[in-house]
């Protein structure tokens, strides 16, 4: 079995790392370069870096911050936020990103994913999906895709959208439960499992990690290939090393 990845996530706005609850109530967590360097030293497998207001604010890419982080961090760096065209993918790769995450722009123009993977390869294109449960209690579970940092409903079914994005060449799906984001109540395992079982590409589970058991559950019960977390790492609750040691004790293969 391939090693499962632990990925700290840096949500950035106005040049600072922030963390919210259910995509709002943002709280400052520090300087992105310092935080990224700390996670590299702790043994993170990758770092994901999302400019969470670039699309809704209509801002350009934060290339200067990406360059600064890439100069200090020597593990794969995924960058998302404000990517609107294949040219943006090129600019971010040149700035030092290893993988590019697209979200709102993939929904506005699904061909962007096909074009970007055609030009740069599936291995560097991640499609981020922000999903919120839309089914009533007692109904078969359904989740709706949201864009623009969770502000805009699309009417799209999250599982079907993930399948379409994989078919268009996406190398990974970064799946965030909006219902669980920042709540520390654990991943939406039903959502994670539904998407993981439906697509032939790796799924990164995101949204809701409150402790180390949640990370293990995301892999074992959610069938995810990687787990992403922010709050438990940013505020010193756990280090990445502690998370990996716990996963290893649980019998989950990780790179120590």
UniProtKB/Swiss-Prot annotation:
Heterodimer of HisH and HisF. Pathway: Amino-acid biosynthesis; L-histidine biosynthesis; L-histidine from 5-phospho-alpha-D-ribose 1-diphosphate: step 5/9. GO terms for biological process: L-histidine biosynthetic process. InterPro entries: Aldolase_TIM, His_biosynth, HisF, IGPS_HisA/HisF, RibuloseP-bd_barrel. SUPFAM superfamilies: Ribulose-phoshate binding barrel. Signal peptide: none annotated. NCBIfam families: hisF. This is Imidazole glycerol phosphate synthase subunit HisF. GO terms for cellular component: cytoplasm. It comes from Cupriavidus pinatubonensis (strain JMP 134 / LMG 1197) (Cupriavidus necator (strain JMP 134)).
